[in-house]
Amino acid sequence: MVDSVYRTRSLGVAAEGIPDQYADGEAARVWQLYIGDTRSRTAEYKAWLLGLLRQHGCHRVLDVACGTGVDSIMLVEEGFSVTSVDASDKMLKYALKERWNRRKEPAFDKWVIEEANWLTLDKDVPAGDGFDAVICLGNSFAHLPDSKGDQSEHRLALKNIASMVRPGGLLVIDHRNYDYILSTGCAPPGKNIYYKSDLTKDITTSVLTVNNKAHMVTLDYTVQVPGAGRDGAPGFSKFRLSYYPHCLASFTELVQEAFGGRCQHSVLGDFKPYRPGQAYVPCYFIHVLKKTG
């Protein structure tokens, strides 16, 4: 339905129900350049995530949207036992390549990487007694569209993700500030909190409404690619990514419902405690849920 109204970059499907917007490989390649490696992660993000996991005694971590593996690599390097999954094989190949290149390091030899589908995650990933922490960051969950129009697939995916968390464990999941995007038509001001890319030249935001309801947000990226132009000069690559616009209040209900209400839930705005009506407009909302039952 979405594609008949508005053309996205969903050129293939890596796992049933989840469109792979990186299926042609080109977007995955440019995205890898765009986000960089672990050195491109902001110091604030790294300190926050590592501090949160260590504060709660987490060791066994499931990254359910690992992409090229940049966060998983950081966690492996920091001594965590990591299982990494993604629906896009084009993205996973970068993580698999890194594991192969560093296979002589015991931590990387033990790093588990699998292709998996959020809609069948409980069958795709053996959770055992559950993971100490499950992370789904970088606006990843918003890649899952609402193809049926009732958010039933969102509910199923979140229920499966929550089932991976052991009692007392954490789910850390985020989304962009779509409340601001839908009210203004553009992304919030401020730099990306996750990575410090110097290759971005432009990001154009578009909102698609269906029956007066926001159905999809698209971000059109123009990225400078070193050596892609004539005579080795920088060139430019454009690609589009499409997202479901999760607003804060409705997503809060969804994630709490995924735990059957048995959770402690806090919301951060760009790594800081968020208060509705505050002056600072965050780029991302981060939900931290501790499973209590």
UniProtKB/Swiss-Prot annotation:
GO cellular component: cytosol; methyltransferase complex
Annotated positions binding (6S)-5-methyl-5,6,7,8-tetrahydrofolate 1: 4, 6, 240
Residue positions, PTM Phosphoserine: 10
Residue list for modification N6-succinyllysine: 46, 191, 196, 201
Catalytic activity line of the entry: glycine + S-adenosyl-L-methionine = sarcosine + S-adenosyl-L-homocysteine + H(+)
Keywords, ordered alphabetically: Acetylation, Cytoplasm, Folate-binding, Methyltransferase, Phosphoprotein, S-adenosyl-L-methionine, Transferase
Regulation acting on activity, per entry: Inhibited by 5-methyltetrahydrofolate monoglutamate and by 5-methyltetrahydrofolate pentaglutamate, inhibition is much more effective by the pentaglutamate form than by the monoglutamate form. Two molecules of 5-methyltetrahydrofolate are bound per tetramer. The binding sites are localized between subunits. Inhibitor binding may preclude movements of the polypeptide chain that are necessary for enzyme activity.
Domain of life: Eukaryota
Modified-residue entries (N-acetylvaline), positions: 2
Catalytic activity, EC: 2.1.1.20
Principal cellular location given in the protein's record: cytoplasm
Intracellular or extracellular location(s): Cytoplasm
Summary of the function given for this chain in its UniProt record: Catalyzes the methylation of glycine by using S-adenosylmethionine (AdoMet) to form N-methylglycine (sarcosine) with the concomitant production of S-adenosylhomocysteine (AdoHcy), a reaction regulated by the binding of 5-methyltetrahydrofolate. Possible crucial role in the regulation of tissue concentration of AdoMet and of metabolism of methionine.
Protein name: Glycine N-methyltransferase
Organism, scientific name: Rattus norvegicus (Rat)
Species lineage: Eukaryota, Metazoa, Chordata, Craniata, Vertebrata
